[in-house]
Design a protein with these regions (language model features):
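Basic, helix-initiating cap at the start of DNA-binding domains
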Residues: 1-20, 24-36, 49-53, 58-61
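Amphipathic alpha-helical packing segments from all-alpha helical-bundle domains
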Residues: 61-64, 109-136, 143-147, 171
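Amphipathic alpha-helical segments used for helix-helix packing
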Residues: 91-111, 158
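Key DNA-contact positions within bacterial/archaeal DNA-binding proteins
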Residues: 39
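A short His-aromatic
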Residues: 42-45, 49
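C-terminal peripheral helix-coil segments that are non-catalytic and often amphipathic
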Residues: 87-90, 121-133, 152, 158-187
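Hydrophobic/aromatic residues within well-ordered alpha-helical segments
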Residues: 5, 48, 55, 59, ...
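Hydrophobic alpha-helical connector segments
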Residues: 54, 68-96, 145-149
Length: 187
């Protein structure tokens, strides 16, 4: 019952935050839509900001699963790394990710938690280590390189999400990403 209540609040909040935005979402309307009380919201999440943090964490987890699946199904380590980077930028145009994670989440919650950043960096570092071991890219500290790549992808995703029309920025970012990634390849 407790998990069902939590899941219902998260699902209702995701819909409301995506369509209405965090600031315009009324907690009374949200809990009424979920068929629950404000007390249930406060019990599970503390407040509206806590609910947003839980929604962002849930979406981040789903993004990570999608990126891991892309890496796992790629033909080779280079395609895994490249596909993961490209997909991350493309996800910045998805309405739910764009509004909840990249716009409202950043504005209300601030930068991503250190734990979330470390998870992304560790995944990228593992891919980069495989590329170095396979002599596909030149040797460097994989964690330092992962931080640089993660930082550029994250900042580019915010830039894409903040655009009034995301298509030109996405295409520009993907083109720039290809240039950056080609620069990593061993000559």
């Amino acid at each position: 019952m407790i998990e069902a209540t939590r899941a219902k609040l998260l699902a209702t909040a995701r819909r409301a935050f995506q369509h209405t935005g965090y600031a315009a979402t009324s907690m009374d309307d949200l809990t009424a839509s979920a068929g629950l009380t404000r007390g249930a919201l406060y019990h599970h999440f503390g407040d509206k900001k806590g609910l947003l943090a839980a929604v962002v964490e849930q979406i981040d987890g789903e993004v990570d699963q999608r990126l891991n699946a892309i890496s796992a199904h790629a033909a080779d380590p280079w395609d895994a790394f490249r596909g993961r980077c490209r997909s991350y930028l493309q996800m910045a145009t998805e309405p739910e990710i764009r509004r909840i994670v990249l716009q409202d989440g950043r504005a209300v919650l601030g930068p991503a938690s250190e734990a979330a950043q470390q998870q992304c960096i560790a995944s990228l570092a593992a891919l980069l280590q495989r590329l170095m071991a396979g002599r596909i890219i030149d040797d460097a500290d994989p964690h330092a390189l992962a931080r640089l790549v993660n930082g550029s992808l994250t900042d580019s995703a915010f830039w894409i999400a903040d655009a009034p029309d995301d298509t030109p920025r996405l295409e520009q970012a993907l083109q720039a990403l290809e240039l950056l990634l080609r620069g990593l390849l061993r000559q």
